[in-house]
């Protein structure tokens, strides 16, 4: 995008903003900075937003991705995708949105698609940069592994993937066991820990070592130590959730 062009500022109506918990503009700007500083995002890259919601990340990307860059996003929230198509794609024709009818007990209880079998609607090795913000924090193990497999499939060689998690490690375990964590991941289901055993997808945490092993299984390597979040009560943090940056290694 030309520097002299007017910056685009879009904010969805309040009833849609509630879907992502508010703070639409602030969180979008925060993660735009992380994508550049942590993810090394370039303005001419092809980007995939898994779980794009109501465009909270797409809106700031409108002012960063050039005409040589391309954005794709998909989500299970119909109204969010409709708003994005009507307000974002009409301004930037290199921004593409797709609705997917994936079942989620909390967000889409009537969905017809199984998240653990859903094939991303893109060709192999299509993307330079993929990001998932507050997506793996809602997926159970079978679903999560399938998504990692699909990410590895559609990511270009040497492409990067930026993911947020709730990671269980010695430090976060200390806060959890001491009752200091605002989020209580005390219910274990398979290889994960959930906040609400009756609605497990509401919030899901994973052992950091298990995530590292899973990523490596599909040829994704963590590029830096995780950037830990404040969710468990730690005082030194980057964001709210934990951030991991992975890269698809050329030779496995």
Question: What residue spans do the PLM features occupy?
Answer:
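Helix-to-beta-strand junctions that scaffold the AdoMet/dcAdoMet cofactor pocket
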Residues: 66, 139-140, 155-156
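A conserved beta-strand element that flanks and buttresses the S-adenosyl-L-methionine
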Residues: 131
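Short catalytic micro-motifs in class I SAM-dependent methyltransferases
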Residues: 134-135
């Amino acid at each position: 995008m030309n520097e002299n062009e007017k910056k685009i500022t879009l904010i969805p109506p309040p009833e849609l903003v509630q879907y992502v918990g508010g703070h639409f503009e602030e969180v979008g700007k925060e993660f735009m900075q992380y994508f550049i500083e942590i993810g090394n995002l370039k303005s001419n890259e092809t980007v995939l937003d898994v779980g794009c919601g109501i465009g909270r990340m797409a809106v700031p990307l409108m002012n960063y991705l050039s005409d040589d860059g391309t954005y794709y996003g998909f989500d299970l929230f119909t109204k969010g995708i409709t708003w994005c198509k009507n307000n974002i794609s009409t301004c930037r024709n290199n921004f593409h949105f797709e609705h997917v009818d994936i079942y989620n007990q909390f967000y889409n209880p009537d969905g017809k698609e199984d998240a653990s079998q859903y094939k991303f609607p893109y060709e192999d090795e299509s993307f330079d940069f993929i990001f998932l913000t507050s997506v793996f924090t809602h997926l159970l193990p079978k679903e999560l592994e399938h998504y990692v497999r699909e990410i590895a499939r559609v990511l270009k060689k040497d492409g990067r993937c930026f993911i947020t998690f709730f990671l269980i490690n010695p430090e976060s375990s200390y806060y959890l066991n001491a009752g200091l964590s605002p989020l209580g991941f005390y219910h274990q289901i398979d290889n994960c820990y959930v906040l609400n055993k009756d609605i497990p997808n509401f919030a899901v945490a994973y052992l950091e070592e298990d995530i590292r092993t899973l990523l490596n299984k599909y040829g994704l390597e963590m590029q830096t130590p995780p950037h830990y979040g404040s969710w468990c009560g730690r005082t030194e943090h980057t964001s709210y959730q934990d951030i991991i940056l992975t890269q698809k290694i050329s030779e496995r």
